[in-house]
């Protein structure tokens, strides 16, 4: 939060925060200087001086440390929140408010972010939510996969997670060069496996067969 929150996020993410309307959710990513994804996120600007970002809990502390060196030169503070994030399925989502954020994912699927411990109506299981996410081809960064992939490796360029017209941000030169002058050597693809518990996807899982 703070008067510089839009400019900070504009210079550190793959999305355009200068033109983002209030209360509209977007998906984006933070990259390092080599263009590798540190974390993916969903963000909502609740006011011109306040943004809420949802990311994997396992990367939140490392992301805060990464952003700290940029925040010291701005009028912006970053606070780790203990909000709950629920995956829900229903044709009529709840009405959003200051302490309840609703993020549509499909005609009947949506996320609910809230700062209290009570679960909203129509919550589905974590396994069911992950299954729907996998079917949509959504790759999410966890602690084990930080700094490993270019956005194109994860199909972020095909999913609208990169804005190639927004201007400079950390890692932008490498991401843009691949987009305009080359083509990805690998792409994330969906496969079925028989293991009861799958390990995090790694480099070898994105190589072309």
Please provide the spans of the model-predicted regions:
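Basic, glycine/lysine-rich polyanion-binding surfaces/domains
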Residues: 1-209
